Design a protein with these regions (language model features):
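Extracellular (secreted or membrane-anchored) zinc-dependent metallopeptidases
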Residues: 1-140
Length: 140
């Protein structure tokens, strides 16, 4: 990951294309210094770990992430407030969580468990599944 002083975009990153250490050459992202407080850094690293935006968000990540469930999530909490996880675009107040059906925020799940033909929304689970390949990508 690289932090730059300025630029046209807050961030840009390669989407991890395979759960394999051979893709280590594209484990790269760039975030603008002025966007660090807006969760852009975590969002761009999410792409490097195979995570995609919420369905229908676009933004160069329209076909989903590394796995079918590797997508962000937008949801309404019990207070009626709409929220979005780290990988989802607005609308909604962004929370500091990757989509995960096992974690609640405002008494609502921050992801969707797979069910029938719906693969669900679970970027946190996808990050766990890519752990071995990521170790090879992020060498110091």
């Amino acid at each position: 990951a690289m932090i730059r002083s300025n630029g046209e975009y807050c961030g840009i990153a390669y989407l991890m294309p395979a759960n394999d250490p051979s893709v280590s050459g594209i484990g790269f992202s760039v975030t603008a210094w002025s966007c660090l407080s807006s969760q852009t850094f975590a969002h761009e690293l999410g792409h490097n770990m195979g995570c995609c935006h919420a369905p229908n968000d676009g933004g160069g990540c329209t076909t989903g992430g590394l796995f079918p469930q590797s997508v962000g999530h937008r949801f309404n909490g019990s207070s009626g407030t709409q929220y979005r996880t780290v990988m989802a675009y607005s609308p909604g107040a962004r929370i500091d969580n990757f989509s995960n059906p096992l974690v609640n925020f405002d008494n609502a799940p921050t992801g969707i468990a797979p069910s029938g033909s719906d693969a669900g929304r679970d970027n946190a689970g996808s990050i766990v599944l890519t752990n071995q390949a990521r170790r090879a990508m992020y060498k110091v």
